[in-house]
Amino acid sequence: MDNLLRHLKISKEQITPVVLVVGDPGRVDKIKVVCDSYVDLAYNREYKSVECHYKGQKFLCVSHGVGSAGCAVCFEELCQNGAKVIIRAGSCGSLQPDLIKRGDICICNAAVREDRVSHLLIHGDFPAVGDFDVYDTLNKCAQELNVPVFNGISVSSDMYYPNKIIPSRLEDYSKANAAVVEMELATLMVIGTLRKVKTGGILIVDGCPFKWDEGDFDNNLVPHQLENMIKIALGACAKLATKYA
């Protein structure tokens, strides 16, 4: 047990150069059955790890849980032990409800740092930016599958339920043309840059936080679009695994 990573509970030798990360451990199970084959590795707390085999390539799929503090633990253990590329595939809310609807897919090139962890690692002026090769590969995989996607900036916020004491800033970010909101991508991008690990993100919309009171939210993601997001992410991981082995 001593040679296992403290939280992921896998060994350094089991970490692949390319890793696909998701928030929900249940989504790991949905992803692994799309692969050609897989090997279950570990499940500790919110961190479930599976070795995936897809299109002749091997890479991990690991869940990181909800929010910046827990996901940072996952990302640090991956980055410090051999990961070279990490892609986050997750859900998000639309900040442009007239354009980006529930079930749409967004590939993000950068994120707004409304988390806390990244500000404890580097000054607030430091950007949260993904790697262009990862971003480009995700977009090309979407094109190959004939799946339309949006591109844009995500707001990564530690706050899910707002309080009246301090107003949410999502309206401001919407006016500034940020595309979507989620909770972990900025943390990944900052840690990736600091650790010289390439990062990227692909997200599926579950609703719009501005319209929750109108019923614009469904935790059961649009099934065929969830499948499309998974296939895009897996395809990108396979392509990148040939380059960053």
From Swiss-Prot:
Indicate the impact reported for V73S.
Slight decrease in catalytic efficiency with inosine as substrate. 8500-fold decrease in catalytic efficiency with 5'-methylthioinosine as substrate
* Effect recorded for V73I: No effect on catalytic activity towards inosine or 5'-methylthioinosine. 20-fold decrease in catalytic efficiency with 5'-methylthioinosine as substrate and no effect on catalytic activity towards inosine
Single GO molecular-function term? Answer: S-methyl-5-thioadenosine phosphorylase activity
Catalytic activity line of the entry: inosine + phosphate = alpha-D-ribose 1-phosphate + hypoxanthine; guanosine + phosphate = alpha-D-ribose 1-phosphate + guanine; 2'-deoxyguanosine + phosphate = 2-deoxy-alpha-D-ribose 1-phosphate + guanine; 2'-deoxyinosine + phosphate = 2-deoxy-alpha-D-ribose 1-phosphate + hypoxanthine
* One Pfam entry name: PNP_UDP_1
Changing D206A has the effect of:
200-fold decrease in catalytic efficiency with inosine as substrate. Loss of catalytic activity towards 5'-methylthioinosine
* CDD domains per record: UP_EcUdp-like
Keywords attached to this Swiss-Prot or TrEMBL record, sorted alphabetically, are: Glycosyltransferase, Purine salvage, Transferase
Quote the pathway field. Answer: Purine metabolism; purine nucleoside salvage
Q: How is this protein's activity kept under control?
A: Inhibited by Immucillin-H and 5'-methylthio-Immucillin-H. Inhibited by 5'-deaza-1'-aza-2c-deoxy-1'-(9-methylene)-Immucilin-G (DADMe-ImmG).
Q: What happens when the gene is disrupted?
A: Severe growth defect in host erythrocytes which is rescued by the addition of exogenous purines. Loss of purine nucleoside phosphorylase activity.
GO annotation, cellular component aspect: cytosol
- Under Enzyme Commission nomenclature, its number is 2.4.2.1, 2.4.2.44
Impact after mutating R45A: 1300-fold decrease in catalytic efficiency for inosine as substrate. Loss of catalytic activity towards 5'-methylthioinosine
Name the domain of life: Eukaryota
BP GO annotations: inosine catabolic process; purine nucleotide catabolic process; purine ribonucleoside salvage; uridine catabolic process
Please name the catalytic residues of this protein.
D206
Q: Where does phosphate bind?
A: G23, D24, P25, G26, R27, R45, R88, A89, G90, S91
**What is the stated purpose of this protein?**
As part of the purine salvage pathway, catalyzes the phosphorolytic breakdown of the N-glycosidic bond in the beta-(deoxy)ribonucleoside molecules, with the formation of the corresponding free purine bases and pentose-1-phosphate. Preferentially acts on inosine and guanosine, and to a lesser extent on 2'-deoxyguanosine and guanosine. Also catalyzes the phosphorylation of S-methyl-5'-thioinosine (MTI) to hypoxanthine; MTI is produced by adenosine deaminase (ADA)-mediated breakdown of S-methyl-5'-thioadenosine (MTA), a major by-product of polyamine biosynthesis.
The entry assigns this protein to a family as follows: Belongs to the PNP/MTAP phosphorylase family.
- Name of this chain's protein: Purine nucleoside phosphorylase
The species this protein was found in: Plasmodium falciparum (isolate 3D7)
